[in-house]
Amino acid sequence: MEGINFSALAPRYGSRPMLSSWSDIGTSSMNGGAFNWGSLWSG
């Protein structure tokens, strides 16, 4: 999923696609994805 998100976000950020979109991906993954995975693992 990160690859898909990165591809979608990259053109939006122009000169710094990697840094900007990886920051967004990291934030959303930690807030959403990692939290959901934590719930699945603990459940």
Swiss-Prot record:
GO terms for biological process: lysis of host organelle involved in viral entry into host cell; microtubule-dependent intracellular transport of viral material towards nucleus. N-terminal amphipathic alpha-helix domain is essential for the membrane lytic activity. This is Pre-protein VI. It comes from the Viruses. Induction: Expressed in the late phase of the viral replicative cycle. All late proteins expressed from the major late promoter are produced by alternative splicing and alternative polyadenylation of the same gene giving rise to non-overlapping ORFs. A leader sequence is present in the N-terminus of all these mRNAs and is recognized by the viral shutoff protein to provide expression although conventional translation via ribosome scanning from the cap has been shut off in the host cell. GO terms for cellular component: host cell; host cell cytoplasm; host cell nucleus; viral capsid. Residues 1-33 form a propeptide. Belongs to the adenoviridae protein VI family. It holds the Pfam family MCPVI. InterPro entries: McpVI (IPR004243). Keywords: Capsid protein, Cytoplasmic inwards viral transport, Disulfide bond, Host cytoplasm, Host nucleus, Host-virus interaction, Late protein, Microtubular inwards viral transport, Ubl conjugation, Viral capsid assembly, Viral penetration into host cytoplasm, Viral penetration via lysis of host organellar membrane, Viral release from host cell, Virion, Virus entry into host cell. The record marks G33, A34 as: Cleavage. Ubiquitinated by Nedd4 following partial capsid disassembly; which might play a role in intracellular virus movement during entry.
